[in-house]
């Protein structure tokens, strides 16, 4: 039986990591790291290759700006010296142009 795709939300402040930077990363994608919230980290651990996520610009803009695909399951986040948190690798599927009211 084929795996059921799960859908997620990944958020970043656009001055830290933006949709335009994600586009420039190309098909190799990027490591989504730096998550230091335990609930969010637990969700990262549940993500599987092929799952999709909305890319949300938080704080500035506050809008969904794209869709990314998980291309590598969770692994230890190299930016976490204590090795408690994880990261995933993602690549852009589509940039969204949603009208804001």
Report the location of each language-model feature.
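A broadly conserved detector of short glycine/acidic/proline-rich loop/turn motifs that flank catalytic sites
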Residues: 14, 59, 94-96
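Short, conserved beta-strand edge motifs with alternating hydrophobic and charged residues
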Residues: 9-11, 55-56, 67
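Short, charged beta-turn/beta-strand-edge "cap" motif at the junction between a beta-strand
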Residues: 56-62
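Short acidic/glycine-rich loop or secondary-structure boundary segments that cap or lie
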Residues: 18-20, 62-66, 77-78
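A short, structural micro-pattern
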Residues: 4, 62, 82-86
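Compositionally biased, charged N-terminal/linker segments
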Residues: 1-48
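Aromatic- and Lys/Arg-enriched surface recognition patch
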Residues: 67-101
